[in-house]
């Protein structure tokens, strides 16, 4: 692990957390995508922050912009690691240091925050996204980046070629040098050792600091640039033969099983978000939340009582978080966040219920996601009458009904 001890490089981690997440609407109607609750007790940003902290990186700047109040509050309450040793996880909003404008792209976000780099004077800068579900030890990627001698390393995950058209794709030679970076290509390139697989970019990068600063300044003066890390900065280095691919399949996380090794999910759509939750409650989930050797950290639930099941209330094949009460109701194949109440005769099946949701007596909720503080009236049906659902709520391509935050239905 890289812990900033004597003889180790000085590293600053920057987490890009300003994403709007339009494809997750209405879950992102009132919050930034990285702040969306996940897995009962977490938020999406907890995964990248846990990976960095577990790996020993404790100088972390989280760049925020879009509807960031929930995210800022979560970071301040859950991720307070500041101390006399210079460790911190800080939420950094758009500061308009280069004029009265917001971030125009992910590269522009870092350009406008170069003061963070000049203050820390790091040898290397980690730039990771904030909205994926995975475990990773970034220190292993840093070690390989240093050994490569390149200006940037891009984390690549192996995906079948036919599934890679939705990603930024990496073509590399046998030595890991990136020869081409293609955005959502119709014919993705194979990996050097397997023509049926493609390196898809995970949106995680490690830069040698001086090279990153120069690239950002050159990009600022490029009128044809969209000022995007994946779309502009990485191709900038590829064109200079100065980019390396890091094969994520070789990343070894303590406590990982063969089943969840190399797991990484983009939960940027309602269906992907829902399916990822359904995996969590399976008997043998691909992604194991219960790995104590590489924990996913979040707000302590020490002040909440345990979940309670009364008057014959039951939960089968489900995750039920602290403070929740199931009173003579039935929950199956569902994920319940904190302080959820399921009342007498209610049925919840195949659902994701976020904090504070209340399901009234005799109500039925199926194949649905209910955002924070939704109240379902007695006898109401959700996920039963598809025509009526479509008239009232968003329904995904996969048929998942989504009820937005604070609604009473």
UniProtKB/Swiss-Prot annotation:
Catalysed reaction(s)?
alpha-D-glucose 1-phosphate + ATP + H(+) = ADP-alpha-D-glucose + diphosphate
Q: Name one GO biological process term.
A: glycogen biosynthetic process
Q: Which residues bind alpha-D-glucose 1-phosphate?
A: 168, 183-184, 201
PROSITE patterns on file? ADP_GLC_PYROPHOSPH_1 (PS00808), ADP_GLC_PYROPHOSPH_2 (PS00809), ADP_GLC_PYROPHOSPH_3 (PS00810)
The domain of life is Bacteria
Q: Which pathway is this protein assigned to?
A: Glycan biosynthesis; glycogen biosynthesis
Q: Which UniProt keywords apply?
A: ATP-binding, Carbohydrate metabolism, Glycogen biosynthesis, Glycogen metabolism, Nucleotide-binding, Nucleotidyltransferase, Transferase
EC id: 2.7.7.27
Q: Which InterPro entries match?
A: ADP-Glc_PPase (IPR011831), ADP_Glu_pyroP_CS (IPR005836), GlgC_bac (IPR023049), GlmU/GlgC-like_hexapep (IPR056818), NTP_transferase_dom (IPR005835), Nucleotide-diphossugar_trans (IPR029044), Trimer_LpxA-like_sf (IPR011004)
What is the stated purpose of this protein? Involved in the biosynthesis of ADP-glucose, a building block required for the elongation reactions to produce glycogen. Catalyzes the reaction between ATP and alpha-D-glucose 1-phosphate (G1P) to produce pyrophosphate and ADP-Glc.
Q: Which NCBIfam families match?
A: glgC (TIGR02091), PRK00725.1 (NF001947), PRK00844.1 (NF002023)
Q: Tell me the protein family, please.
A: Belongs to the bacterial/plant glucose-1-phosphate adenylyltransferase family.
Q: How does it assemble?
A: Homotetramer.
Q: Supply the name of the protein.
A: Glucose-1-phosphate adenylyltransferase
Its gene name is glgC
